[in-house]
Amino acid sequence: MLEIQNLKAGVEGKAILKGVNLSINAGEVHAIMGPNGSGKSTLAQLLAGREGYNISGGSVSYDGQDLLELSPEERVCEGFFLAFQYPVEIPGVNTTYFLRAAVNALREHRGEAELSAVDFLKLMREKIQLLELDESLLKRS
């Protein structure tokens, strides 16, 4: 599903990734661990499509397509994105509204019908119960 072969990349003339190889099959979960400066964040940002990195070699394919050729927006629709650990609050936009917009954008990309507010709230409640989260999450900004 995700295949990284001999990926070499850097920023501002400094080599950071020096031949990364990684294969992740559908349904697998992997953790990328290592000391500070080993390239974990660089790899994540490259996969998400952040600008400013120079790729000097290697390839990244996802589900048979060249991930490096996709725009950041296209990568998001394929499931590659970075989320902030402590996101900035956007005044007037609550978590439920934000998540519904994100889910519906993904559904549109897949050719699926948009979820109504009622259907999305039902889905959110199911997932909140499944994950044993507090329902106050629905009202959080």
What are these regions (language model features)?
Residues 31, 76-85, 125:
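ABC nucleotide-binding domain signature
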Residues 24-26:
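Conserved hydrophobic segment flanking the Walker A/P-loop of ABC-type ATPase nucleotide-binding domains
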